[in-house]
Amino acid sequence: MRASYKGIYKPTYPKKYAGDPNRIVYRSLLERRMMVYLDKNDAVEFWASEEIPIIYRSPIDYRIHRYYPDFIFKLKTGKKYMVEIKPYRQCFPPKKPKKQGRSYMAEQLEYIKNQAKWQAAKVYCEGNDLEFKIFTEKDIGVYS
């Protein structure tokens, strides 16, 4: 399993950030790479990270939870997006190993939970003139 990277992002153009530009947290190198892209891209009018809560019901514990999508941004063309950043392997059901252990069960539960989150995000986007996308390392680029 890959090491997790976490830190505070300091934007080059803080006025483009919709929120507190001193409290932008990234939880992976993919998220950080997306932040740099949104911050420095002239086509982006504004962007935010984990600023809007989406309410969803977990199919695991049947309770209501809050989900904060990784990014929301608006292009100067007027198009608005909500984006979740995930490793490619987490976008599909885990492959069933010959011997099922705890890691397989944890991956399965995480996949089920993510599907519920993403469905709630899609519903939210439909009612708020946003397009929901899931970006992986294949969309953003490999770790560096």
Give the residues covered by each predicted segment.
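Electrostatic, structured charged patches in enzyme active sites and in nucleic-acid/phosphate-binding
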Residues: 1-144
